[in-house]
Amino acid sequence: MGWLPLLLLLVQCSRALGQRSPLNDFQLFRGTELRNLLHTAVPGPWQEDVADAEECARRCGPLLDCRAFHYNMSSHGCQLLPWTQHSLHTQLYHSSLCHLFQKKDYVRTCIMDNGVSYRGTVARTAGGLPCQAWSRRFPNDHKYTPTPKNGLEENFCRNPDGDPRGPWCYTTNRSVRFQSCGIKTCREAVCVLCNGEDYRGEVDVTESGRECQRWDLQHPHSHPFQPEKFLDKDLKDNYCRNPDGSERPWCYTTDPNVEREFCDLPSCGPNLPPTVKGSKSQRRNKGKALNCFRGKGEDYRGTTNTTSAGVPCQRWDAQSPHQHRFVPEKYACKDLRENFCRNPDGSEAPWCFTSRPGLRMAFCHQIPRCTEELVPEGCYHGSGEQYRGSVSKTRKGVQCQHWSSETPHKPQFTPTSAPQAGLEANFCRNPDGDSHGPWCYTLDPDILFDYCALQRCDDDQPPSILDPPDQVVFEKCGKRVDKSNKLRVVGGHPGNSPWTVSLRNRQGQHFCGGSLVKEQWVLTARQCIWSCHEPLTGYEVWLGTINQNPQPGEANLQRVPVAKAVCGPAGSQLVLLKLERPVILNHHVALICLPPEQYVVPPGTKCEIAGWGESIGTSNNTVLHVASMNVISNQECNTKYRGHIQESEICTQGLVVPVGACEGDYGGPLACYTHDCWVLQGLIIPNRVCARPRWPAIFTRVSVFVDWINKVMQLE
């Protein structure tokens, strides 16, 4: 080999080694501080103005008397620690300023390779014998002298001679000189169940032996799986995980030339150990749903085999028209039978590859969600203002807060402020005349209020919605700058709808639309949101752009995280999303007006829908499209739908050409021009077929639920 190829090889190797982060040797405990309770134990001084946590790790790593460090996120300070959480007299505390990093060798409960680097605190052999202290020569004499470098502390199991069986110790039994401690390798310690989505082991190398890249770093490979966005995926340190529903756990590697690889982990097999039998995967698969789906639909096992746009699904065991990795044999526990809608990768809802070459995959949003509501425990008349029963739990089973209590929520309505409302104990009541029935504040700190486990009495018919009011005045909403009068989604054209938002999942992908009804509130469809109770960490709304995939740094783009979701009244199919901060209103981002309560849009009114959804080949769906539609009466709509259209729904005229809402548009607005303003009269929900010619499109009528919308925005 000549000197030039050798030089190039050395440069390449040095680059590969240079991509390894010193943080790879540490376990991270976010928002945690480690204190030693002894006054005589003093940590190292704070070293301020450190570049980042990697610099702290670089300082701590080679020091034998540094086993952990604090990193102050605010001051970028670093404090080296001579102890870990397993040291005597130490205790972990929550911290709003610090992250704790501890050397893996000191806190791992398993060993890598033969455990020469193991520095844990196991002090008993596999046979149950206590270990002899390394500093003692009785009852068993030996040649080892404890030093800071060899780590022969106390009577902890160690492997100073590289025994292939792993750490061992001399015993306190004269007849048994030494014995293995039986500490499992990290590979053996935890097996993989199903495809390993719930794997939480501590293996940090791939099957080829490459070291894994930390999930919280973006070098050498940038990626979307940021731990703070994927809290449920346990993306700790650089351990093998499966956040995207791959065939088995994997990781990004520290080799710049190899982005990601699978990890070599044992399968649990058919005879599951007791510790695995209660895993999340198996609990999630109990009571598989056939006619509806829960959460994200990972347990859905029904036979729906078309998308919400009516496109037939491709068989999972076929690779045409679309090639894919979800081969049924490799995903045995995902039930990838025939061409049924499934969710093998933890997407937002059940989906499938489609039989249309130009459309790779689509959701099956037409599958209903399983009801989460309790069987009603009583009934009420009218709107329930006179209800004086003793039901004291919400429709989801959450206990009500006492009306006189201020914990966990400070109530607007109390026995003192509303003496005629019967606000006794924590019984469900309706002090504000809510048209959707009795409600209560809840004992859940994250749920301010909800409607109760009650239903309208059978002999009580709800009043019909009112006629349109004579005078309607709107201010500071529903205004836009139209560059063209030709604003005409399927069959639509690129248009301007500054209140239409794009909902983005944790990987930044568009999956639904929504409408900006207040600076910090977005209205969307229940079918788009997988949970109204669990945090939607990592989900965002994007505003101010007509591009589905805007370029980084696009001037008018606003990206705002979703703080929480509030589910609408029963049958509404609505969800309000509260944003972490208010958006900035301008020509590109505007509020849409809400209609008056119970407002009925006159037949013939021209409205428009907007979205980035599937256009079934009629146009380019990478930009926002707007399509015009005329409202028809519910009576006319029911002639097509055989009387199934309710007053809480609104219809638009079916056209000969396919114009309507499709995959990706759901949750977006049906906006009608009323009194010189654009008003949110309807919300796009999944229909039986996408943009079916000559069939009316159905929307949720927003005016029926506008009192709930205003109530949530006021109370929250």
Swiss-Prot record:
State the disulfide connectivity: 56-78, 60-66, 110-186, 131-169, 157-181, 191-268, 194-333, 212-251, 240-263, 292-370, 313-352, 341-364, 379-457, 400-440, 428-452, 477-593, 512-528, 607-672, 637-651, 662-690
**Which molecular-function annotation in GO is an example for this chain?**
receptor tyrosine kinase binding
The reply on keyword Glycosyltransferase is no
Positions of the Kringle domain: 110-186, 191-268, 292-370, 379-457
Which superkingdom? Eukaryota
Keyword tags: Disulfide bond, Glycoprotein, Kringle, Repeat, Secreted, Serine protease homolog, Signal
GO cellular component terms given for this protein: extracellular space; vacuole
Show where the PAN domain sits: 19-105
**What's the protein called, per UniProt?**
Hepatocyte growth factor-like protein
Subunit architecture: Dimer of an alpha chain and a beta chain linked by a disulfide bond. Interacts (via beta chain) with MST1R (via SEMA domain).
> CDD domains recorded for this chain?
KR, PAN_AP_HGF, Tryp_SPc
Identify the gene encoding this protein.
Mst1
Q: Which family does it belong to?
A: Belongs to the peptidase S1 family. Plasminogen subfamily.
Q: In which tissues is it expressed?
A: Liver. Lower levels in lung, placenta and adrenal.
Glycosylated residue positions: 72, 173, 305, 620
Record PTM: Cleaved after Arg-488, probably by HPN/Hepsin, to yield the active form consisting of two disulfide-linked chains.
Supply the source organism's classification.
Eukaryota, Metazoa, Chordata, Craniata, Vertebrata
| Localization per record | Secreted
**What residue stretches are annotated with the Peptidase S1 domain?**
489-714
